[in-house]
Amino acid sequence: MSLAQFLAEYEPHVHITAFVLGSARLSVFFMTAPFFGNAVAGMVVRSAVVLALYLIVHPMVLASVAPLMPAEGGGWVLLVALLLKEIFLGFVLGWLAGLAFWAVESAGLFIDNQRGASQASLSDPLSGDQSSPTGAFMLQSTCYAFFASGAFAAMLGLIYSTYECWPVGELLPSALFTKPGAALFFGERMAGLAALTVLISAPIVLACLFADAALGLVNRFAPQLNVYVISMPVKCGVASFLLLFYFAVLMTDAAERFAAFGIDLATFRAFIP
């Protein structure tokens, strides 16, 4: 079938409705996920990317939405409900995909707080929000590893699979909002985010704590030495030295953290039969 025949098979308003409903999931996903922040690409660039990625699934979305047309009377209520469902799914998918990135950024914030550089804040180029120097550096490095390693293509395949599991033309079952395990699932992901943040930052934070303990002993036996003045340079030096070796390990383990999105998505699918 040629492109002209495909476009002529349905009325223009059917194509437009399918595009609005189908692209909402991808649009909200990219707005929520931190690796495609507002400061990296503007609205025009993001819209072009979403359009290019959406066209792959447009025939599938069109086949799901076309039976709902023409929308007469209460039909528009159904379309609005479907749009809200797509926004909800896009937000959940973007939130699950961003957990690994937010954990790395929070770990960098913990490290800066422990080494005494918590007041050194800057605007993160990816998200546009305020962040610490180490947090912004670790987040950007993780994003570079995410795209360079091919993890983005794998994640995009998982996003495309959701259009088959949860068709655009169907509402979510009420079981998602009535099952107690659904709320527990999101709580566990938040707990996992906090645990991963502590785990990533633990080596550098512990080294800074040991440096504080050593400086405390120095202050005990040499009270005339102003330990407060030298504590921050010492801890910054220790943290920077350890980051030279720890950064390679952090980037090597990034693939495992990226793969967690597939595991979380499979768990979330169990709540929506």
Q: Which sequence ranges carry the predicted segments?
A:
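Hydrophobic alpha-helical segments and their helix-loop boundaries in membrane
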Residues: M1-P273
